[in-house]
Regions:
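Nucleotide phosphate-binding/pyrophosphate-handling subdomain across enzymes
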Residues: 1-2, 10-13, 75-185
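Acidic, Mg2+-coordinating active-site environments of NTP-dependent enzymes
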Residues: 1-80, 93-111
Length: 185
């Protein structure tokens, strides 16, 4: 749980704060979610007259055979895997596709979103610059994770990469849960 000082101590409290952006009549896309958090989102959406499109109920996404497979009431999409590394990016891409389809966008728009997404400092491979020039045979990755979920995401991504010697340089504010971030690594 990140930003607890602003959003609340529990998942339902955090979901309630995040549900504050729900607008009347605007579809609410909900990715994989704790049941209590989903219930809060659904209740706020119902009060606001906003339709909910929740993962596992209204749409599904999975990696199958090196592809991203998305399904909702409009049918099945077989797309390339996300441009962004990390197994969690399939879920993120699924939420983006659900939003695009709710807006009436076609398969080409969904594929473009999946293959062109760029998120600096989230498992970003550095390819240019002084650090790369000083060690041209080394892969250098940058990730701005700073909470236990971020550490889990980095660990899951590293687990899918070819095995080799790995060094991690970590820097974050002293208000962050460093031990929680490092635990899965």
């Amino acid at each position: 749980l990140d930003h607890k000082q602003y959003l609340g101590e529990t998942l339902p409290e955090i979901a309630g704060e995040k549900a504050g952006i729900i607008k009347r009549g605007v579809p609410v896309i909900v990715g994989p979610q704790d049941e209590a958090g989903l219930a809060v989102m659904e209740a706020k959406a119902a009060r606001s007259g906003a339709p909910v499109l929740a993962f596992g109920q209204h749409w599904h996404v999975a990696e199958e055979g090196g592809r991203l497979v998305f399904q909702d009431e409009n049918g099945l999409l077989d797309l390339p895997l996300p441009n962004l590394p990390g197994p969690f990016q399939v879920q993120n891409a699924g939420a983006a596709i659900a939003a695009l389809r709710a807006l009436g966008r076609d398969e080409a728009a969904c594929e473009a979103a999946v293959t062109r997404a760029y998120w600096p400092a989230r498992m970003q491979r550095l390819r240019h610059g002084p650090l790369i020039d000083s060690a041209p045979k080394v892969e250098l990755w940058l990730d701005g994770g700073h909470n236990p979920a971020g550490g889990e995401a980095v660990a899951a991504t590293l687990a899918r990469m070819p095995k080799r010697e790995t060094h991690l340089i970590c820097g974050m504010l002293n208000t962050k849960d460093v031990a929680g971030y490092m635990r899965p690594l």
